[in-house]
């Protein structure tokens, strides 16, 4: 293999990594924290190691799948949006056929992991992949694609309960609802960054729908998320340390509200990124609560 061929292969792999957002782990982390919390709740603090590893790998792979299919759906629009015009598909660096092939390969890999678990998880995973494919196209038909994303982003929660328990108990849906509300809140912050560009190209979003009341609606969803996280903890009979995590959730929410007050793009992006620390805090306090109580 010549040096030129090696360079060409490495350049192509770098483009695939960019398409899959491997270079931007924030989305993977936001997807991972509630999934890990679900495993802790379902297993009362001691999840099966095999299940844990499968879900961590599955989250990484499925987040990549979601990014690929999203960029494929938006390939003709991203070129007109400042933040996305340099993405591999939008710029033409990667073909649609290459993107779909990578999506199929990663999807099959994720499904192979799921086959190591029980039949209920397999069934739920099929729904999950359908939801993942549907999401990018919801931005064309609904003013609230963030609500649909909340379902997609929370689907690992019933899957985690099913993997650990063989069923999805009622209390699992408190965590599902909490993560759904939280996702709508932070993805609306993200949508505020692109609002002007989205209006130009006809993309719908909650930031556009809420208009000048965007901050207030984000606060509503943050409060609903807090209430549902609280109910999830009460259902699992959690103690003081988890409660500290919930207080931290409120503190972070207030901080994010201050950041987005100006509606400036850098501040909204900073508020969005801050949610990684929210997820980490909730997971760590839940883990510590199970460890000590």
UniProtKB/Swiss-Prot annotation:
Example of a GO MF term: 4-hydroxybenzoate polyprenyltransferase activity
GO BP of this protein: ubiquinone biosynthetic process
Transmembrane portions of the chain: 26-46, 49-69, 102-122, 148-168, 173-193, 217-237, 240-260, 272-292
Enzyme superclass (EC): transferase
Pfam families recorded: UbiA
Membrane topology according to the record: Multi-pass membrane protein
One GO cellular component, as annotated: plasma membrane
EC number: 2.5.1.39
Location in or out of the cell: Cell inner membrane
InterPro entries according to UniProt: HB_polyprenyltransferase-like, Prenyltransferase, UbiA_prenyltransferase, UbiA_prenylTrfase_CS, UbiA_sf
Keyword Membrane set for record: yes
Keywords, ordered alphabetically: Cell inner membrane, Cell membrane, Magnesium, Membrane, Transferase, Transmembrane, Transmembrane helix, Ubiquinone biosynthesis
Reactions catalysed, as given in the entry: all-trans-octaprenyl diphosphate + 4-hydroxybenzoate = 4-hydroxy-3-(all-trans-octaprenyl)benzoate + diphosphate
Pathway info: Cofactor biosynthesis; ubiquinone biosynthesis
Necessary cofactors: Mg(2+)
Family as reported in the entry's similarity comment: Belongs to the UbiA prenyltransferase family.
Function comment: Catalyzes the prenylation of para-hydroxybenzoate (PHB) with an all-trans polyprenyl group. Mediates the second step in the final reaction sequence of ubiquinone-8 (UQ-8) biosynthesis, which is the condensation of the polyisoprenoid side chain with PHB, generating the first membrane-bound Q intermediate 3-octaprenyl-4-hydroxybenzoate.
Protein's name according to its UniProt entry: 4-hydroxybenzoate octaprenyltransferase
């Amino acid at each position: 293999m010549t040096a030129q061929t090696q360079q060409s292969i490495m350049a192509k792999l770098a483009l695939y990594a960019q398409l899959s957002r491997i270079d931007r782990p924030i989305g993977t982390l936001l997807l991972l924290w509630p999934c890990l919390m679900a495993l802790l709740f379902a297993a009362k603090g001691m999840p099966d190691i095999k299940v844990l590893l499968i879900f961590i790998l599955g989250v990484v792979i499925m987040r990549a799948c979601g990014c690929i299919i999203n960029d494929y759906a938006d390939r003709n629009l991203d070129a007109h949006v400042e933040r996305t015009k340099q993405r591999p598909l939008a710029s033409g660096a990667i073909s649609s056929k290459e993107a779909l092939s990578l999506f199929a390969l990663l999807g099959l890999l994720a499904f192979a992991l799921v086959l190591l678990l029980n039949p209920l998880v397999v069934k739920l995973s099929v729904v999950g992949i359908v939801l993942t494919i549907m999401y990018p196209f919801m931005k064309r038909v609904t003013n609230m694609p963030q609500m649909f994303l909340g379902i997609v982003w929370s689907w690992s929660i019933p899957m985690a309960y099913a993997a650990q328990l063989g069923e999805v108990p009622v209390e699992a849906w408190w965590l599902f609802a909490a993560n759904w509300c939280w996702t709508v809140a932070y993805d609306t912050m993200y949508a505020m960054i692109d609002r002007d560009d989205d209006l130009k190209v006809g993309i719908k979003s909650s930031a556009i729908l809420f208009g000048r009341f965007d901050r207030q609606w984000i606060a509503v969803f943050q409060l609903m998320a807090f209430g549902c996280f609280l109910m999830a903890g009460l259902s699992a009979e959690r103690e003081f340390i988890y409660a500290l995590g919930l207080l931290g959730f409120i503190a972070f929410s207030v901080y994010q509200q201050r950041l987005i007050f100006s509606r400036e793009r850098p501040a909204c992006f900073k508020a969005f990124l801050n949610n990684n620390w929210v997820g980490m805090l909730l997971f760590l306090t839940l883990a510590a609560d199970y460890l000590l109580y």
